[in-house]
């Protein structure tokens, strides 16, 4: 335990950055507005001039912050519908949102200054184990073939409000900023202790996107920080409670002495003691922990996770949040794919001199398929088809122009194909394309009060071209016009598109 605390204090430094006075500066709120305009997911800031930034209202807000009763009204009237207890709903809405967005930028400043304050001759340590989300699937395809067990983890959230504040206390010593953070958290919760309702989380995430991401990333980085510590100590932790711990150490020393005598001896036999070969991947609120070894070792890691959440984050989690499966006999749902590592048989004919014989081998292959039932359920929920997958019209879109209807259906189809292009089987995607294409035709026919057959004959190839995806257009250049849909080999091609930016929307493209 002392080693655990020492490892924690070594990597956490208290920074003397007092950022609370910046809350009285107008340019902080201008930065918040610029982030909303330039961010990948814009944050709307309401104002009196067509949702544009109003410097006059910001100046009024700063003047009100200087007043003594500014925070007293909000604290003494917790049952008010809006923050800051102001008579005019419009001003209250603007002050609430612009203040929270400005504070979100405020709490990020100490972390930025810490990186800038590093000496030039001392390079900032690079975490080679951190990768972009674009490389997750190639990473799984490359590494998971050699692993045995997989733990599917649901990272628990939300946690105690005070724990979130304490996580930042290690790096921010600005007491007024921490008190202001407590104020925001308590305002968006129904009680003063927990954010227990999903409604409170949704409201907080919707109105304070940047602050929510900052707090969530701080919590997850803290969790992964101690997970890295457990990974470094994994050679000892699985054996700490064993009665034969000393005997195993003695056995390890014997093996090291044996290696000195026989340097050509392979060291791979002691991977259980030396290198458990653990790989960790996280996306949104889910994580995957895959490793070699026995089922007993995975059960140990499950206990470590539960104890870490319970004793450090004060979060009581249920064991069902962690599922342990054997890779060879199960599949896992991750980022919109059903992935597995099955053993496929391979028959090899070998001939030696006059004798020939067959060699039956089994090879592992990382297989990813599209969850057809789940995606058809999304289409059914969005009223593109019935629950069984029968295409229907979209009445709510009949007021749009023909071009807008075609564009919307085509964009949804291209997004599905673009994201799920790495699937090893494309039959499900072609079924989804058929549903969307026929649903589009029914919608246009309903708008013009015609039949589907008549409308498709009148529109011709323009209607079909709208549903071509990028990879299919490449194949179209290689075939004649009579074979536009006979892509006999395209279903075996696996293409991982690494230029996806708004990946969250593509995982669930209809919500």
From Swiss-Prot:
One of its GO terms (cellular component) is chloroplast. One of its GO terms (molecular function) is RNA binding. One of its GO terms (biological process) is mRNA processing. It is found in: Plastid, Chloroplast. Coiled coil: none annotated. Keywords: Chloroplast, mRNA processing, Plastid, RNA-binding, tRNA processing. Signal peptide: none annotated. It comes from the Eukaryota. InterPro entries: Domain_X, Maturase_MatK, Maturase_MatK_N. Pfam families: Intron_maturas2 (PF01348), MatK_N (PF01824). Usually encoded in the trnK tRNA gene intron. Probably assists in splicing its own and other chloroplast group II introns. Belongs to the intron maturase 2 family. MatK subfamily. This is Maturase K. It comes from Bromus inermis (Smooth brome grass). The gene is matK.
């Amino acid at each position: 335990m002392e080693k655990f605390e020492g490892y924690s204090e070594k990597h956490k430094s208290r920074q003397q950055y007092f950022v609370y006075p910046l809350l009285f500066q107008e340019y902080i709120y201008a930065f918040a507005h610029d982030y909303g305009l330039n961010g990948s997911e814009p944050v709307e800031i309401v104002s009196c001039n067509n949702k544009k930034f109003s410097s006059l209202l910001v100046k009024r807000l700063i003047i009100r912050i200087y007043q003594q009763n500014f925070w007293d009204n909000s604290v003494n009237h917790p049952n008010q519908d809006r923050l800051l207890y102001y008579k005019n709903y419009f001003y209250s809405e603007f002050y609430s949102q612009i203040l929270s967005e400005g504070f979100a930028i405020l709490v990020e400043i100490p972390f930025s200054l810490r990186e800038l304050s590093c000496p030039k001759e001392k390079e900032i340590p690079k975490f080679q184990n951190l990768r972009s989300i674009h490389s997750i699937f190639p990473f799984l395809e490359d590494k998971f073939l050699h692993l045995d067990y997989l733990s599917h983890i649901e990272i628990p959230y939300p946690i105690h409000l005070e724990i979130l504040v304490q996580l930042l206390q290690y790096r921010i010593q600005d007491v007024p900023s921490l008190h202001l953070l407590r104020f925001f958290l308590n305002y968006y919760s129904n009680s003063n202790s927990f954010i227990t309702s999903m409604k409170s989380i949704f409201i907080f995430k919707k109105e304070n996107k940047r602050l929510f991401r900052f707090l969530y990333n701080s919590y997850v980085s803290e969790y992964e920080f101690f997970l890295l510590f457990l990974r470094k100590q994994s050679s000892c932790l699985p054996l700490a409670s064993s009665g034969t711990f000393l005997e195993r150490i003695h056995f390890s020393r014997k093996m090291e002495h044996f290696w000195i005598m026989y340097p050509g001896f392979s060291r791979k036999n002691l991977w259980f003691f030396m290198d458990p070969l653990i790989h960790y991947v996280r996306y949104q609120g889910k994580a995957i922990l895959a490793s070699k070894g026995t089922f007993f070792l995975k059960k140990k890691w499950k206990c470590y996770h539960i104890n870490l959440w319970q004793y450090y984050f004060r979060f009581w989690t249920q064991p069902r949040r962690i599922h342990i499966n054997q890779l060879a006999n199960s599949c896992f749902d991750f980022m919109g794919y059903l992935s597995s590592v099955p053993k496929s048989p391979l028959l090899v004919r070998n001939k030696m001199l006059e004798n020939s014989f067959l060699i039956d081998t089994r090879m592992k292959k990382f297989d990813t398929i599209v969850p057809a039932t789940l995606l058809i359920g999304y289409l059914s929920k969005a009223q593109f088809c019935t629950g069984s997958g029968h295409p229907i019209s979209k009445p709510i879109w009949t007021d749009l122009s023909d071009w807008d209807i075609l564009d919307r259906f085509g964009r949804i189809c291209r997004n599905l194909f673009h994201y799920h292009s790495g699937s090893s089987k494309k039959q499900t995607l072609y079924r989804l394309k058929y549903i969307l294409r026929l649903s589009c035709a029914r919608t246009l026919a309903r708008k013009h009060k015609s039949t589907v057959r008549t409308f498709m004959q009148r529109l011709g190839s323009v209607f079909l071209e709208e549903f071509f995806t990028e990879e299919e257009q490449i194949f179209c250049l290689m075939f004649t016009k009579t074979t536009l849909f006979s892509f006999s080999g395209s279903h075996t091609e696996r293409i991982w598109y690494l230029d996806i930016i708004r990946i969250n929307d593509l995982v669930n493209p209809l919500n």
